[in-house]
Design a protein with these regions (language model features):
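Alpha-helical scaffold domains
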Residues: 1-159
Length: 159
């Protein structure tokens, strides 16, 4: 609820920096908590350059699966029109390359989401990334992202 209140307040999101995000993210331990934190707070703050790339890269290097997931999910607002993003191939693909060997299901699913969101803005870059890195990426990521590029759906058999 706190994340939603901050997101809905006109000025509160503009006051978020590294210290505030650390405090608000303390104890995140489920996909729901992480995704709300990253989509509502961390990603938009990163998109607005209120926090440095080094903060998000630090999360990606964390031993905690939830912080690694938060790093990847924070790319969604960079690329989502609904979140105010205009597309950020560089930061998104940098995180994906950093975490491509991570086989934790929560991290792999977040990478799939990050790449599928970028594919809406820059399908050529995502296609090239898949071609170059498919051997290093989790199979789930390759399958879901390729499906998105080819059919527009993550799981085309589940309409």
């Amino acid at each position: 609820v706190a994340y939603e209140l901050i997101r809905a307040h006109p000025a509160a999101p503009l006051g978020l920096g590294a210290r505030e995000l650390a405090r608000l993210g303390r104890g995140i331990a489920s996909w729901g908590e992480v995704d709300c934190f990253a989509v509502y707070l961390a990603g938009p703050a990163w998109r607005r350059r209120q926090v440095p790339d080094s903060l998000i890269l630090g999360w990606a290097r964390s031993g905690d699966r939830w912080w690694r997931r938060a790093a990847l999910v924070s790319t969604v607002p960079l690329n989502s029109r609904a979140q105010g993003g205009s597309g950020d191939r560089g930061r998104t693909l940098r995180l994906c390359r950093l975490l491509e060997g991570d086989r934790d299901p929560m991290v792999a699913k977040a990478m799939s989401w990050a790449l599928r969101e970028l594919a809406k803005r820059d399908p050529g870059a995502v296609r090239a990334h898949l071609e170059a890195r498919s051997g290093a990426l989790p199979a789930l990521v390759v399958r879901e992202v390729r499906n998105k590029l080819e059919t527009g759906l993550k799981n085309p058999g589940r309409r």
